[in-house]
Amino acid sequence: MKNSNGFTLIELVVTIALVGILLGSAIPTFHRAVSETQSSVNISNMTIIKQSFMQYYYDNHMIGDPHFPRLPQDSLMDNTYRQTILGDGRTPDMLFSGNLPYNTNQKPYIYYWESDTLNGHITNRIVIQDSDLDSPSYNEKVVGEI
């Protein structure tokens, strides 16, 4: 009678193969979940920026000078733009408790305006867009309308 205190080579190979198959199916699911979460965070950040810029517009409207925050030179809300002095003396960072949000890859969003004249009414829109090619929310936009 043989005393067996360990695994045979075949048992070890089968176990490693099964673990490999399980990991192979779990990694894409994990990656997809991370990507969806990052996209949600980016869209939430863009929505927060839009809401703050809309509030800035309404705050200035109350004192008789309605306008959106100044546009960045190259549309990117980067470090240079974050320190730009706005019409009321604040910087964009000050509108966000000292930290204008970036996307999950730490890249700035794009900010620009659009205007439409429809039925004799002028509609102004601000657009916040993710332009980072590596971002899961690439080309997603959040639009605010006045």
Go through the PLM ranges and name each one.
Residues 2-30:
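N-terminal single-pass transmembrane signal-anchor helix
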Residues 4, 108-109, 143:
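Residue-level detector of intrinsically disordered/flexible regions characterized by low predicted structural confidence
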Residues 32-34, 69:
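Proline- and acidic/polar-enriched loop/turn elements at helix boundaries
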Residues 58-131:
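Extracellular/periplasmic head regions of type IV pilus-like filament subunits
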Residues 125-146:
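Low-complexity, S/T/G/P-rich flexible repeat/linker segments used as non-globular hinges
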